[in-house]
Amino acid sequence: MAMKKLLIASLLFSSATVYGAEGFVVKDIHFEGLQRVAVGAALLSMPVRTGDTVNDEDISNTIRALFATGNFEDVRVLRDGNTLLVQVKERPTIASITFSGNKSVKDDMLKQNLEASGVRVGESLDRTTLSDIEKGLEDFYYSVGKYSASVKAVVTPLPRNRVDLKLVFQEGVSAKIQQINIVGNHAFSTEELISHFQLRDEVPWWNVVGDRKYQKQKLAGDLETLRSYYLDRGYARFNIDSTQVSLTPDKKGIYITVNITEGDQYKLSGVQVSGNLAGHSAEIENLTKIEPGELYNGTKVTKMEDDIKKLLGRYGYAYPRVQSQPEINDADKTVKLRVNVDAGNRFYVRKIRFEGNDTSKDSVLRREMRQMEGAWLGSDLVDQGKERLNRLGFFETVDTDTQRVPGSLDQVDVVYKVKERNTGSFNFGIGYGTESGVSFQAGVQQDNWLGTGYSVGINGTKNDYQTYSELSVTNPYFTVDGVSLGGRIFYNDFEADDADLSDYTNKSYGTDVTLGFPINEYNTLRAGLGYVHNKLSNMQPQIAMDRYLESMGDPDASDFAADDFTFNYGWTYNKLDRGYFPTDGSRVNLTGKVTIPGSDNEYYKVSLDTATYVPIDNDHKWVVLGRTRWGYGDGLGGKEMPFYENFYAGGSSTVRGFQSNTIGPKAVYKNGAHTSWDDNDDYEDCTQESGCKSDDAVGGNAMAVASLEFITPTPFISEKYANSVRTSFFWDMGTVWDTNWDPSSAPSDVPDYSDPGNIRMSAGIALQWMSPLGPLVFSYAQPFKKYDGDKAEQFQFNIGKTW
């Protein structure tokens, strides 16, 4: 009864009248409403203890302290004689958190944001925080143009003061831009200006960048694009006065109006450089030269500032400040650019450290460095080290960090942070390819043997037409100067007829050794010696083969053996940004070989492969790839180049959409030769005196292949796997011909195989995936230019480890 009177009194009078201005001595403290929170924990959070004399201010502080714990959503403090009665209502505990209706935002991202706000399973539920989260999520949807979106938190009570929390999303549809207006433009049309925007009110089918869905961030980017467009064309006084974004009543349409002031065009009258140039005034002035009467260009000014910083960075000035201040003369419409440079301190490298290389030895990474310890810091040298590490192929990512040495004004440590990839593989499996049929592979390949950088491989494969095995070893640093040494031994049993070639069997084995000589950062020369033994059998006489056998002095042979020694040479230019799935740069690879004295054959052979990647966006997700492959070979000393050394085209690695090796010259079998076999191994003979035409490819001594690809982001693939999957649209073309072909030696219905103009073409789509099994390549191509005897194969794929 006394407590009820006290509560009524507290509503009618101030706290001072309740507790008394002089206060009272607390004899005991009682709690009501505690469930999850222990009494001891609650007492520790209070500033009042038994025996204290308390007044109104102490009671207010007690209430605030209990609220501050975050455990209570209601607190009342009452007096019952000399007992302090604390009535609390605990906040419920979150038992579970679920989401419904969220399509644009993933559950994991929502959980991270909730946890950052203190909302997680097992914690108390703060309804105020929940309201802020609802509003924040709705603001996010508004920023991406979904103005009809709503987010509601549904709290379901459970026993023992627990609750289930469910966030219910109604995302709605994105508001589409109905019209973009630019007001105040006179020099350029609205259509011209909007054509450079990401946001559009109209998007043609071919525009893969434009978007009618409104997003606040994209609008901000487009306004910067508009500003740069004018500043780059001399409009130094250009200004965006205001921007209005209007929403239609149904919240499904957006109207954007941008008000601008163009101003006049201004020309640069000169550039004045001042400040601490660190003795490099001449080089800096070369970077600031302008042509007389050149229009003011904001992008060029920014590039000039960056170039000055890079120049100073190469000389150890790691943190230079470069500021350009345009002085505008409205009278003669000119701009004088005043550039202030402060080179700052020159920094020296105390240490170069590596992090993340758990397998690779420090020495393997350190030998790729161009920046030296103890020397001044060169930003270009640090970047070269990063490029070289990337090209090793040992790492998924390589990052650099320049860290100042504590207590030093002129020293830094350079840290290379790497994430190693699995450079070794033990493979035993089965694959299938449209070109090779069922294939069995087994092998051990380690590109970074025991962390030493050595490449060691024991590999083998067996399919419908080939049995192949190889042992190879390469030491990329045979000498401290970077001269590499590589060698291999191999065995190959090749059934040509099963590979859609003219019929013969070749059992070969051999070895070679090669030295690589680095010329500079991007160029390497190679030279080596090789030996190969070829044992040919089951040769069915055909014109190209007969020509070779005649040049060897054994025209009627059905079996033949040759031992050849070769001088092998090559040159590689490699400026790709990374080893696998590159997106920028070029690679040129020239290889060749020529027989040397002691060989049964006398011939030479040269191949040239090129690849150029050109990114068309800043993120390197859209890339144009151009590839070419050229090959030529011929005999020496009156002998022919062996037919089994011919070039071939067709298949997934050359001209897609055609069966492997089927492009180019076909076998013309001589009278009496076995020309074809059925399923019972019964054969038919050629009975024509002039020879029999066939569809069996024989290749040629000359080849030309070109490909143009447009690499695009792969749909439905998350960013996590973007670097292991690649999609592209392609156009392939190529041909193979025989420069020694004599049309008079064949029947009249046989094409002229010496004509290089018989070009095949195809177009299609390809998907590449670096799967756990190894490379997996799908392609679908439609040949749209082909010739008699060509074999089309629209869908092609290869699964399994390739060597």
UniProtKB/Swiss-Prot annotation:
It is found in: Cell outer membrane. It holds the Pfam family POTRA. GO terms for biological process: Gram-negative-bacterium-type cell outer membrane assembly; protein insertion into membrane. GO terms for cellular component: Bam protein complex. Residues 1-20 form the signal peptide. Keywords: Cell outer membrane, Membrane, Repeat, Signal, Transmembrane, Transmembrane beta strand. Its main location: membrane. Belongs to the BamA family. This is Outer membrane protein assembly factor BamA.
